[in-house]
């Protein structure tokens, strides 16, 4: 169980990291950190998994190209804005409602469903995320918190139950729309940094459901 809990911490950290990338633009300091040995080693480690390798290779390629991109931080912030802060027609809005809602508007049923899930588990997400509950950053932050909470148990049976809850969340709240979101990111993000992040998110969600199912 000790190894499982340690792995849970790693899983949560990955979801929190992905959440942070979709939550706001990277600052210059944060961008500089992505060129550090620490982060590059972390990415290399993830890339050792065959499922994640294509997305990691794309992300590393984008990071390498950022080092020679003029006004890299400003340009990457503009990419973030074009993708996630504009209109559905011209961007890849990071809300479940825009992909699986009925109205084509924000705060549709997926947002209400997510609010109910958060209330049911009595879990608070990052208070800096002042967005509808079905924003991808909120859903990923919540998932990380859900994983960490499961580490509080000392019973194998309870841990298995928590795995089933996590698997259901990924399959019903993420994999129902993240594939469509990923396609839009690739259609719009010509530079490719955020497109590679969305690919990594999708690949990791699929990989994680296999792990949770015991495959």
Curated annotation (Swiss-Prot):
GO CC, alphabetical: cytoplasm
Some GO term, biological process aspect, for this entry: which one?
protein folding
Q: Does the keyword Metal-binding apply?
A: no
Q: Which SUPFAM superfamilies match?
A: TorD-like
Q: Where in the cell is it found?
A: Cytoplasm
Show the Gene3D superfamilies listed in the entry: 1.20.120.1820, HscB, C-terminal domain
Q: What is its main location?
A: cytoplasm
**Which keywords are on file for this protein?**
Chaperone, Cytoplasm
Q: Which InterPro entries match?
A: Chaperone_TorD, DMSO/NO3_reduct_chaperone, HscB_C_sf, TorD-like_sf, TorD/DmsD_chaperones
Tree of life domain:
Bacteria
Record family assignment: Belongs to the TorD/DmsD family. TorD subfamily.
**What PANTHER family would the database entry show?**
CHAPERONE PROTEIN TORD (PTHR34227:SF11), CHAPERONE PROTEIN YCDY (PTHR34227)
**HAMAP family, per the entry:** TorD (MF_01150)
The UniProt function text for this chain reads:
Involved in the biogenesis of TorA. Acts on TorA before the insertion of the molybdenum cofactor and, as a result, probably favors a conformation of the apoenzyme that is competent for acquiring the cofactor.
This chain belongs to which protein, by name?
A: Chaperone protein TorD
- The species this protein was found in: Vibrio atlanticus (strain LGP32)
Give the organism's phylogenetic lineage: Bacteria, Pseudomonadati, Pseudomonadota, Gammaproteobacteria, Vibrionales
UniProt lists the gene as torD
């Amino acid at each position: 169980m000790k190894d499982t809990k340690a792995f849970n911490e790693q899983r949560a950290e990955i979801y929190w990291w992905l959440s942070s990338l979709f939550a706001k633009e990277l600052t210059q300091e944060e961008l500089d950190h992505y060129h550090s040995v620490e982060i590059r080693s972390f990415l290399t480690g993830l890339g050792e998994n065959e499922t994640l390798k294509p997305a990691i290779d794309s992300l590393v390629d984008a990071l390498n190209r950022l080092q020679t991109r003029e006004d890299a931080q400003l340009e990457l912030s503009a990419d973030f804005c074009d993708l996630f802060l504009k209109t559905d027609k011209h961007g890849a809005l990071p809300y479940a409602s825009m992909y699986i809602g009925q109205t084509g508007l924000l705060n549709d049923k997926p947002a209400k469903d997510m609010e109910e899930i958060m209330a049911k588990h009595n879990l608070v997400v990052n208070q800096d995320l002042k967005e509808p509950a079905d924003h991808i950053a909120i859903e990923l932050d919540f998932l990380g918190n859900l994983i960490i909470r499961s580490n509080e148990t000392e019973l194998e049976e309870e841990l298995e139950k928590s795995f089933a809850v996590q698997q259901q969340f990924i399959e019903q709240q993420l994999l129902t729309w993240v594939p469509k979101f990923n396609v839009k990111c690739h259609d719009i993000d010509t530079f490719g940094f955020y497109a590679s992040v969305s690919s990594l998110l999708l690949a990791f969600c699929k990989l994680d459901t296999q792990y949770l199912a015991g495959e």
